[in-house]
Swiss-Prot record:
The keyword Phosphoprotein applies. Residues 675-735 form the Cullin neddylation domain. The Cullin neddylation domain restrains the RING domain of RBX1 in the E3 ubiquitin-protein ligase complex; this restraint is removed upon neddylation of the cullin. Belongs to the cullin family. Neddylated; which enhances the ubiquitination activity of ECS (Elongin BC-CUL2/5-SOCS-box protein) E3 ubiquitin-protein ligase complexes. Neddylation leads to structural rearrangment in the complex that allows interaction between the E2 ubiquitin-conjugating enzyme and the acceptor ubiquitin. CBC(VHL) complex formation seems to promote neddylation. Deneddylated via its interaction with the COP9 signalosome (CSN) complex. Pfam families: Cullin, Cullin_Nedd8. Component of multiple Cul2-RING (CRL2) E3 ubiquitin-protein ligase complexes consisting of CUL2, Elongin BC (ELOB and ELOC), RBX1 and a variable substrate-specific adapter; this complex is also known as ECS (Elongin BC-CUL2/5-SOCS-box protein) complex and may consist of CUL2 or CUL5. Component of a ECS(VHL) or CBC(VHL) complex containing CUL2, RBX1, ELOB, ELOC and VHL. Component of the ECS(MED8) complex with the probable substrate recognition component MED8. (Microbial infection) Interacts with human respiratory syncytial virus (HRSV) protein NS1. This is Cullin-2. GO terms for molecular function: protein-macromolecule adaptor activity; ubiquitin ligase complex scaffold activity; ubiquitin protein ligase binding; ubiquitin-protein transferase activity. There is a cross-link at residue 689 (Glycyl lysine isopeptide (Lys-Gly) (interchain with G-Cter in NEDD8)).
Length: 745
């Protein structure tokens, strides 16, 4: 083959080429030598001398394709009932033949057509050199275009009607020719696949659109039939079956771009159009916890934009009712434990249900959280919410030495689970106050199971609420280890004195930061330290003043405890007592009988505290009341009980200081209210300092938003705090509007 341009007889060359392309397009056998010769002929025509013949070749090829497709169209029409089969057969043959022709015409495609082809800009803005209505196309594209114009479009109505009928028969249980249906539908895609813009437009317009309409009508009627013959449970199962079948059908016949559209149409007709029916049954299904029906309903409703909210609300209501049922009427004796375990049981039950039945959907998890938040924070009318106090007591019970038969690991597991319930509390500041008081008692009276568990719990609270929430708890915990170090230093201080100092007692001290501990520094009574303790107190004050300048020690005698040996009985006993009880008992060192007046003089306690202390000793029968009167008065006298006995050689005399009294609970709640007022005032000042000017409602919303992590403030409390800050001249009402506040710099 010569590459040099030469004179070519077009008619002679075209006749040879025509014979070959007829064979190619009908998939007849063509010898390799013939193929190569025709390839050379096309090259020769494109580079012919004196004038290239590429344009004429293109025109003649186009005429051939038009005639060939018209001929095939006529034969398809003659096939009557076999239109789909014949169309499919000719399409399979023609589309492959067109691919081979495109290869044969490769030189024409690359050297003539591409160089003269209109660009996107030419098509958009116009170009004078080429007929805009008949743009040049590569031969493969031209063949497909001829098929679309001369075969598909004239047969469109017949083809679509037959395709829809065949697919309807498939839905009815018949078994149509899958290969033919898929092939015909795919031809609508294939004829425009060469287009860069909207290659599926033709397929969507002539087939997809009418198919979706027909699908909607079919499933509208199908849903109506199913509703008449089924209850809700059966209806949902049948609908899911229909959807699954339709999905398989889509994959058998349609282009992938249609899958979701078809399923969406089915869902609209069988689910969205009957939401009222499904929602009406939702209540009973959830209340009876029919897991299979819940799973089916979830799958159906999830696919519809307005489907799930009703189901979510129904589950939230159900969890709320279950939670209230589980946490009401709990026995007073073990209420904290029962309350927490009941909430955890409900939480665990519904977490499992949501994960296994509802696919772990976060919308339902949020509903669970909302429901349990309302359960945990539930309060009877005109009463306070008990949850913060109950949860603090639950922790207290777990962290005390008295926690029955539990290892540290078991306590750790329970405290980890407890955080689940804790996160639902609105009034976390109330919990913090109660927890701090109970922690103080555990630490001061040595009641903690272990300091590691105490630290672990504080860290869990820190993770849940942040550093600020636990800062005081951390300081309380730290004070205990600092105090242990101070005791060692104090003992070394005593040993290193120039003169030998004998304190006469074993002495241990806790130095606590006043700002961190929830302890009152104003004692309930005056008190004179017993002589036996004076030296220890004086030496520690000396030691402390030498080591720390500018710090003031305040002795909290009402919290101190000690051990007293009872040497006057046949059996050696050790009593663990408060300092007040110790002061009364030590008075009997000098005399077996002591009057009330003498005790008052030696201890300097007021009447109420002294009487309470004496009664605690009378209750355990360590001393006797020598008066015939039952009540203690100024004339009473007391004597040691020389016949005292106890099952234990070491025993503890409990006092009201170690028990939670109603007054103490009330004080805790009052302290919470005061703290809230200060917190809100600080929040208002922070916000106004940043914003300078703010309207009333906007300020209220920002304060609520900032406070929500600790508690839910009432609007009335916020308003009172605003008024207080106006009085204190931190903020002022704007002169322009009474509904606006300005920050006072």
């Amino acid at each position: 083959m010569s590459l040099k341009p030469r004179v070519v007889d077009f008619d002679e060359t075209w006749n040879k080429l025509l014979t070959t392309i007829k064979a190619v397009v009908m998939l007849e056998y063509v010898e390799r030598a013939t193929w190569n010769d025709r390839f050379s002929d096309i090259y020769a025509l494109c580079v012919a001398y004196p004038e290239p013949l590429g344009e004429r070749l293109y025109t003649e090829t186009k005429i051939f394709l038009e005639n060939h497709v018209r001929h095939l169209h006529k034969r398809v029409l003659e096939s009557e009932e076999q239109v789909l089969v014949m169309y499919h057969r000719y399409w399979e043959e023609y589309s492959k033949g067109a691919d081979y022709m495109d290869c044969l015409y490769r030189y024409l495609n690359t050297q003539f057509i591409k160089k003269n082809k209109l660009t996107e800009a030419d098509l958009q803005y116009g170009y004078g050199g080429v007929d805009m209505n008949e743009p040049l196309m590569e031969i493969g594209e031209l063949a497909l275009d001829m098929w679309r114009k001369l075969m598909v479009e004239p047969l469109q109505a017949i083809l679509i009607r037959m395709l829809l009928r065949e697919i309807k028969n498939d839905r009815g249980g018949e078994d149509p020719n899958q290969k033919v249906i898929h092939g015909v539908i795919n031809s609508f895609v294939h004829v425009e696949q060469y287009k860069k813009k909207f290659p599926l437009k033709f397929y969507q317009e002539i087939f997809e659109s009418p198919f979706l309409t027909e699908t909607g009508e079919y499933y509208k009627q199908e849903a109506s039939n199913l509703l008449q013959e089924s209850n809700c449970s059966q209806y949902m199962e049948k609908v899911l079956g229909r959807l699954k079948d339709e999905e398989i059908r889509c994959r058998k016949y349609l282009h992938p771009s249609s899958y979701t559209k078809v399923i969406h149409e089915c869902q609209q007709r069988m689910v969205a159009d009957h939401l009222q029916f499904l929602h009406a049954e939702c209540h009973n299904i959830i209340r009876q916890e029919k897991k299979n029906d819940m799973a089916n309903m979830y799958v159906l409703l999830r696919a519809v934009s307005t489907g799930l909210p009703h189901m979510i609300q129904e589950l939230q209501n159900h969890i709320h009712d279950e939670g209230l049922r589980a946490t009401s009427n709990l026995t007073q004796e073990n209420m904290p434990t029962l309350f927490v375990e009941s909430v955890l049981e409900v939480h665990g039950k519904f977490v499992q249900l949501i994960n296994t039945v509802l696919n772990g959907d976060q919308h339902f998890m949020s509903a669970l959280d909302k429901a349990l938040t309302s359960v945990v924070n539930y309060r009877e009318p005109k009463s306070v919410c008990k949850a913060p106090e109950l949860l603090a007591k639950y922790c207290d019970n777990l962290l005390k030495k008295s926690a029955k038969g539990m290892t540290e690991n078991e306590v750790e597991d329970r405290l980890t689970s407890f955080i689940t319930v804790f996160k639902y509390i609105d009034d976390k500041d109330v919990f913090q106050k109660f927890y701090a008081r109970m922690l103080a008692k555990r630490l001061i009276h040595g009641l903690s199971m272990s300091m590691d568990s105490e630290e672990a719990m504080i860290n869990k609270l820190k993770q849940a609420c942040g550093y600020e929430f636990t800062s005081k708890l951390h300081r309380m915990y730290t004070d205990m280890s600092v105090s242990a170090d101070l005791n060692n230093k104090f003992n070394n201080f005593i040993k290193n004195q120039d003169t030998v100092i004998d304190l006469g007692i074993s002495f241990q001290i806790y130095v606590l930061q006043a700002g961190a501990w929830p302890l009152t520094q104003a004692p309930s009574s005056t008190f004179a330290i017993p002589q036996e303790l004076e030296k220890s107190v004086q030496m520690f004050e000396l030691f402390y003043s030498q080591h720390f300048s500018g710090r003031k020690l305040t002795w909290l005698h009402y919290l101190c405890t000690g051990e007293v040996k009872m040497n006057y009985l046949g059996k050696p006993y050790v009593a663990m007592v408060t300092t007040y009880q110790m002061a009364v008992l030590l008075a009997f060192n000098n005399s077996e009988t002591v009057s009330y007046k003498e005790l008052q003089d030696s201890t300097q306690m007021n009447e109420k505290e002294l009487t309470k202390t004496i009664k605690s000793l009378l209750d355990v029968k360590m001393i006797n009341h020598d008066s015939e009167k039952e009540d203690i008065d100024a004339e009473s006298s007391f004597s040691l009980n020389m016949n005292f006995s106890s099952k234990r050689t070491k025993f503890k005399i409990t006092t009201s200081m170690q028990k939670d009294t109603p007054q103490e609970m009330e004080q805790t709640r009052s302290a919470v209210d005061e703290d809230r007022k200060m917190y809100l005032q600080a929040a208002i000042v922070r916000i106004m300092k940043a914003r300078k000017v703010l309207r009333h409602n906007a300020l209220i919303q920002e304060v609520i938003s900032q406070s929500r992590a600790r508690f839910n403030p009432s609007i009335s409390m916020i308003k009172k705090c605003i008024e207080v800050l106006i009085d204190k001249q931190y903020i002022e009402r704007s002169q322009a509007s009474a509904d606006e506040y300005s920050y006072v710099a």
